[in-house]
């Protein structure tokens, strides 16, 4: 099983795929999960809006849309990541672009692991998971 990276209508971000894949797999192990087929699909705001409208009936931009195909402890899914929104949010929150990109990637991975972020208590747990994961990619 593999973690794959592709783009739809955006330039590929300059991340080290090997390190990123190793990091994702380590986070999955931390949650007693295994990697199935996971695809990170980098796209524009226009594309994420189209996907959001078509599949979720939401008429708004977002930084990530996660489609979960997991079965049991084997984690599989597609992560559509809007690079325009990553750039916007990194400036808005005054954080490094790549830190924001990795936060969004792991946010999608945590969704695939069963994390939610609709309720305030769930958002707190999600943020804690993101922060723990980001510590690992920094080291």
Swiss-Prot record:
Sites where the protein binds Zn(2+): 107, 111, 117
Transmembrane segments: none
Entry superkingdom: Bacteria
Keywords: Cytoplasm, Endonuclease, Hydrolase, Metal-binding, Nuclease, Ribosome biogenesis, rRNA processing, Zinc
Matches recorded under InterPro entries: MetalPrtase_cat_dom_sf_prd, YbeY
Biological function: Single strand-specific metallo-endoribonuclease involved in late-stage 70S ribosome quality control and in maturation of the 3' terminus of the 16S rRNA.
Descriptive protein name: Endoribonuclease YbeY
Organism: Azobacteroides pseudotrichonymphae genomovar. CFP2
Gene, per the UniProt record: ybeY
């Amino acid at each position: 099983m593999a973690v794959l990276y592709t783009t739809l209508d955006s330039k590929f971000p300059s991340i080290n795929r090997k390190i990123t894949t190793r990091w994702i797999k380590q986070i999955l192990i931390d949650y007693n999960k295994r990697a199935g087929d996971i695809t990170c699909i980098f796209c524009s705001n226009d594309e994420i809006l189209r996907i959001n409208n078509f599949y979720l009936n939401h008429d708004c931009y977002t930084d990530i849309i996660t489609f979960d195909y997991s079965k049991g402890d084997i984690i599989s899914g597609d992560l559509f990541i809007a690079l325009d929104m990553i750039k916007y949010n990194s400036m808005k929150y005054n954080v490094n672009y790549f830190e924001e990109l990795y936060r969004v990637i792991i946010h999608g991975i945590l969704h695939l692991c069963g994390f939610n972020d609709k309720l305030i208590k769930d958002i707190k747990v999600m943020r804690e998971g993101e922060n723990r994961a980001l510590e690992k990619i920094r080291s």
